[in-house]
């Protein structure tokens, strides 16, 4: 990119025959365990997608009857309605549950899991809901099959929730396997697990080709530079959303990803 006096996203777009996005990619902010205080930060900043929530324990975060997460979704909805500056602000509620719904109801009890997802979707209204990692089947083939069957149950019943595949969907090969089988409505594309950055680009483009949502994720443990490079890939491939990273404090990850995206748009706009 430097040798050609071009932006990284422009080099990636040329390589894959795409067009760099002329608008911001929705940014997904993650709260860590400060899921209440950080949710307020996200709402006040106008986060596109929030709050992640780190729902990784049945007893303390999901509840033995799913009541704790249900209460949190209701609180989050009410908080957005109270704090939003404009009524047009309609963020997506995206919660990562780390397989805890499957632990509670049983990985293969798809009707029971769908019943619970329906309650969550109702509590989230009027906001759209995404649930990441509803179950963890302990191996790739079973995970793919369980995600596909739960998605089919959700779609059959018309439940307004998107399922996001995470566990066991790590490499480019895994992404293609899950996308081919429609094992979820959206796949998280994890930058660290994919090796070279070209694999991230190809995974996003493959999901788009298959009609599957492409969430360009990663980890809170990346560097600021890796996050900036990921922004260029997301803009070149037009991912559906990108994770604010690194860190779990909301401000730092959002600042790095948001500013890099704005820089791309400003520099390209100046040339137009």
Label each residue range with its predicted role.
Residues 272:
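Expand to "…catalyze enediolate/carbanion chemistry for C-C bond making/breaking, isomerization
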């Amino acid at each position: 990119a430097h040798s050609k006096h071009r932006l990284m996203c422009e080099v990636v777009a040329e390589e894959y025959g795409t067009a760099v996005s002329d608008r911001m990619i929705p940014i997904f902010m993650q709260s860590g365990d400060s899921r209440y205080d950080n949710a307020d930060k996200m709402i006040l900043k106008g986060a596109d997608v929030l709050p992640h929530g780190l729902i990784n324990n049945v007893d303390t975060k999901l509840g033995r009857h799913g009541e704790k997460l249900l209460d949190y979704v209701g609180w989050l909805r009410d908080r957005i309605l109270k704090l939003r500056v404009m009524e047009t602000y309609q963020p997506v509620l995206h919660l990562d549950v780390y397989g805890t719904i499957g632990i509670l109801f049983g990985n293969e009890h798809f009707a029971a899991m769908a019943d619970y997802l329906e309650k969550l979707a109702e509590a989230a209204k009027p906001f759209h809901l995404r649930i990441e990692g509803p179950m963890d089947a302990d191996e790739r083939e079973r995970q793919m099959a369980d995600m596909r069957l739960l998605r089919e149950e959700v779609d059959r019943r018309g439940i307004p929730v998107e399922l996001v595949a995470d566990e066991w969907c790590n490499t480019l090969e895994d992404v293609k396997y899950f996308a081919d089988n429609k094992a979820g409505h959206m796949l998280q594309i994890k930058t660290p697990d994919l090796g070279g950055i070209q694999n991230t680009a190809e995974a996003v483009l493959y999901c788009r080709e298959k009609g599957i949502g492409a969430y360009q994720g990663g980890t809170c443990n990346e560097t600021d530079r890796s996050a900036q490079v990921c922004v260029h890939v997301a803009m070149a491939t037009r991912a559906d959303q990108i994770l604010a990273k690194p860190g779990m404090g909301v401000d730092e990850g959002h600042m790095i990803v948001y500013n890099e995206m704005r820089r791309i748009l400003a520099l390209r706009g100046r040339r137009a």
